Swiss-Prot record:
This is 18S rRNA (guanine-N(7))-methyltransferase. It catalyses: a guanosine in 18S rRNA + S-adenosyl-L-methionine = an N(7)-methylguanosine in 18S rRNA + S-adenosyl-L-homocysteine. Gene3D superfamilies: Vaccinia Virus protein VP39. Belongs to the class I-like SAM-binding methyltransferase superfamily. BUD23/WBSCR22 family. It comes from Homo sapiens. One of its GO terms (biological process) is rRNA (guanine-N7)-methylation. Induction: Up-regulated in CD8+ T lymphocytes by treatment with anti-CD3 and in B lymphocytes by treatment with CD40 ligand and anti-B cell receptor antibody. In macrophages, no induction following LPS treatment. Down-regulated by a combined treatment with TNF and IFNG (at protein level). Its EC number is 2.1.1.-.
Length: 281
């Protein structure tokens, strides 16, 4: 579970690690954009939001707004919280559609109770497990974060937090503090047998406990580009599925597959799937 190389959290506090140089990587590295966008898409699937209904979402550790751009593409409204001024500056330069807030999630989320319909977070929560000052207590900061997150969510909604735990002890620390704050839920692990593609998603419920979706398996994986491509241009972050014709067979199949990944009951695909019904008298 631990990273083979040096982890970013060991290089100092996030507001210093994510400087202007790191921020530029997030908008000019095609592989990084692709990975971040796919993880945001998976997190949104696991939120299990109502179909065809815009929701008001919170993005913790929003960075340059890559995950937020995906939320906008899906028709949702969102607010992003991040501790790095450089990352937020890049988001502003990109003219993203969401609102941005500079803040430390370890000090709590400053919104009224019941503000958000859901929350996602990509590669951020593990930063709370490290103390960069003598006064910082990881367990207390995690509890403060989860307690405030529980408060700002509408009852019955979800939070899906993608994270990179360093070891099993760190994962236990995170889940314990989430449970103490009132959440139920569990961990969804995609591609558990793959060293590179393995992803952890902490699915938290702010209401009664419900089912935990299954993680994706290796035979569902897509090939990730192995080379990073840098450019001076900024990539437009519109998803390819936006080009699908609504109600077409491809659109229906993609929607059914998305529902399966969310854990819903879906009828098997047949030769009649997506076929337009004949008019009746």
């Amino acid at each position: 579970m631990a990273s083979r190389g040096r982890r970013p959290e060991h290089g100092g506090p996030p507001e210093l690690f994510y400087d202007e140089t790191e921020a530029r990587k997030y908008v000019r590295n095609s592989r990084m954009i692709d990975i971040q966008t796919r993880m945001a898409g998976r997190a949104l699937e696991l939120l299990y939001l109502p179909e065809n209904k815009p929701c008001y979402l919170l993005d913790i550790g929003c960075g340059t707004g890559l995950s937020g751009s995906y939320l906008s593409d899906e028709g949702h409204y969102w607010v992003g919280l991040d501790i790095s001024p450089a990352m937020l500056d890049e988001a502003v330069d990109r003219e993203i559609e969401g609102d941005l807030l500079l803040g430390d999630m370890g000090q709590g989320i400053p919104f009224k109770p019941g503000t958000f319909d859901g929350c996602i977070s990509i590669s951020a929560v593990q930063w709370l497990c490290n103390a960069n000052k003598k006064s910082e207590n990881p367990a207390k900061r995690l509890y403060c974060f989860f307690a405030s997150l529980f408060s700002v969510l509408v009852r019955g909604s979800r939070a899906v937090l993608q994270l990179y735990p360093e070891n099993s002890e760190q994962l236990e620390l995170i889940t314990t503090q989430a449970t103490k704050a009132g959440f139920s839920g569990g961990m969804v692990v995609d591609y558990p047998n793959s060293a590179k593609a393995k992803k952890f998603y902490l699915c938290l419920f702010s209401g009664p406990s419900t089912f935990i979706p299954e993680g994706l398996s290796e035979n569902q994986d897509e090939v990730e580009p192995r080379e990073s491509v840098f450019t001076n241009e900024r990539f437009p972050l519109r998803m390819s599925r936006r080009g699908m014709v609504r109600k077409s067979r491809a659109w229906v199949l993609e929607k059914k597959e998305r529902h399966r990944r969310q854990g819903r009951e879906v009828r098997p695909d047949t030769q009649y799937t997506g076929r337009k019904r004949k008019p009746r008298f």
